[in-house]
């Protein structure tokens, strides 16, 4: 009678809780019993593992085998436990030394031939293994991804026989050395390519400098989508911690976390997207668009065309920076600290306010169109701007305004001031931080309170207005928020919603 224990990792949301594979062998009729709340794919591991061991010229024990995946109440799916199960059986049958598995974690799916295949969600498991101080054995196809967790000892393998030879000391495998991830020089469209629209460019600069939410409104063809596509080029690079969080999310949904390293995500879902597609969901909760836009930009074009119920689910993550998906068996929290940029037309036909008088929408149609956007949702958007039509110029003169590089430098300076002062962008300041870093002179405080009363702004809107004023002061490299900062910030608030 013998017992072996091997460590592995499950995948729950973007977390990787530890799973202990316990293998017990006893005399009796040859059988293999798998317990510990395994899903169908894990139950199928029994046949894959048996074939992989036999086809690797190793001995499959003809004994009664009991496999337990602990903790039993943790859901487990996929083929990620195949390698750990195989090594547990080999250790229990004394074909590999069990002591060599004490400080090792294993991930990998086995082919019938014994080859070790790639699995998804390796980066969260690598970060957890580094924290636990263990070595991680992964398929070679996942090794570069696992090395994103700097300081982690990674063993890359192609076949089950390689692992057995390594653990027995016959052919030791050197820790995998990453080739080094190059910072991809992704070309962004230049801000100078947008003709005119100086006010909109100014709003874009403020939004980038303080991570503020932004809503463009205007007739079709005025450059709203064009302007929004320029925002990613203005944002500062991700920090190492932020880049790891983004890559971990992409690893979970199999979006090749190394292909966009380390750029900020830019997500643009279609207006027909459902609620689960936007915020996440499913019987086994998966990340939605707001999580895929974590530390990046979520652009919602044609905002009123989205279903109202879909838009309303954005309220909580816009405030908290995360979303909780609850199901009968699971309750999973996903990160969702994104910057919302939206665009919309002023009416169903899009031409309200045009001098040509093309709009034929009735007041009832316009009201019904705008009612799709609730007051609480619009209240959470810091910058509201109407993008007017510019004079048509098919061959415009050379733009004299700042290009993307110059604007990005201003944004970087402002963000650096914010990080030194409070450790986050202005848009993410909580109430204590707002009171500490957005103080006003008594006369300016009274002026702002009076203005908010006249414009019937909510307290939340007033707080967001203060954050925008703080960003304007940072762009001017001044510590004190002046009256003209408040006046400009007030221009970006709608006097009345709907």
Q: How would you describe each model-predicted region?
A:
Residues 35-46, 61, 68-78, 285, ...:
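Basic, amphipathic alpha-helical bundle interface domains used for macromolecular binding and assembly
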Residues 171-206, 210, 238-290:
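P-loop NTPase nucleotide-binding/switch module
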Residues 295, 301-302, 313:
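Walker B catalytic acidic pair
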């Amino acid at each position: 009678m013998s017992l072996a224990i091997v460590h592995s990792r499950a995948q729950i949301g973007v977390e990787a809780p530890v799973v202990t594979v316990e293998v017990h062998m006893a005399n009796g009729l040859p059988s293999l019993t798998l317990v510990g709340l395994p899903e169908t794919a894990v139950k199928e591991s029994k046949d894959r593992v048996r074939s992989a061991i036999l086809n690797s010229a190793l001995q499959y024990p003809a004994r009664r085998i009991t496999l337990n995946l602990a903790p039993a109440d943790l859901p487990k799916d996929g083929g990620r436990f195949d390698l750990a199960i195989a090594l547990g059986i080999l250790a229990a049958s004394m074909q590999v030394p069990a002591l060599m598995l004490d400080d090792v974690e294993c991930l990998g799916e086995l082919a019938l031939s014994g080859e070790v295949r790639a699995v998804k969600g390796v980066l969260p498991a690598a970060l957890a293994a580094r924290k636990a101080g263990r070595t991680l054995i992964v398929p070679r196809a996942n090794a570069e991804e696992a090395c994103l967790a700097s300081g982690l000892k990674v063993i890359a393998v192609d076949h089950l026989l390689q692992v057995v030879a390594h653990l027995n000391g016959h052919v030791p495998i050197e820790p995998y050395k990453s080739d080094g991830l190059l910072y991809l020089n992704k070309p962004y469209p230049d801000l100078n390519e947008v003709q005119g629209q100086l006010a909109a460019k100014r709003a874009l600069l403020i939004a980038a400098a303080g991570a503020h939410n932004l809503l463009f409104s205007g007739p079709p063809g005025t450059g709203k989508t064009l302007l929004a596509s320029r925002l990613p080029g203005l944002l500062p690079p991700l920090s190492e911690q932020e880049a790891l969080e983004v890559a971990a999310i992409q690893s979970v949904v199999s979006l090749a976390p190394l292909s966009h390293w380390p750029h900020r995500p830019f997500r643009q879902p279609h207006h027909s997207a459902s609620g689960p597609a936007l915020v996440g969901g499913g019987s086994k909760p998966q990340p939605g668009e707001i999580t895929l836009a974590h530390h990046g930009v979520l652009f919602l074009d044609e905002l009123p065309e989205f279903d109202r119920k879909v838009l309303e689910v954005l309220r909580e993550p816009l405030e908290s920076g995360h979303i909780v998906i609850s199901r009968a068996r699971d309750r999973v929290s996903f990160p969702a600290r994104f910057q919302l940029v939206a665009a919309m037309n002023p009416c169903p036909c899009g031409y309200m306010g045009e001098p040509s008088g093309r709009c034929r929408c009735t007041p009832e149609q316009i009201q019904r169109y705008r009612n799709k956007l609730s007051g609480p949702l619009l209240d959470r958007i810091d910058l509201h701007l109407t993008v007017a039509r510019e004079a048509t110029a098919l061959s415009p003169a050379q733009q004299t305004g700042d290009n993307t590089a110059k604007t990005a430098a201003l944004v970087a300076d402002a963000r650096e001031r914010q990080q030194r002062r409070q450790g986050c962008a202005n848009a993410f300041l909580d109430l204590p931080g707002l009171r500490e870093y957005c103080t006003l002179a008594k006369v300016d405080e009274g002026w702002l309170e009076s203005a908010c009363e006249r414009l019937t702004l909510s307290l939340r809107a007033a707080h967001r207005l203060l954050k925008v004023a703080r960003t304007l002061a940072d762009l001017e490299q001044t510590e004190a928020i002046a009256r003209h900062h408040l006046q400009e910030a007030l221009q970006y608030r709608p006097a009345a919603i709907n």
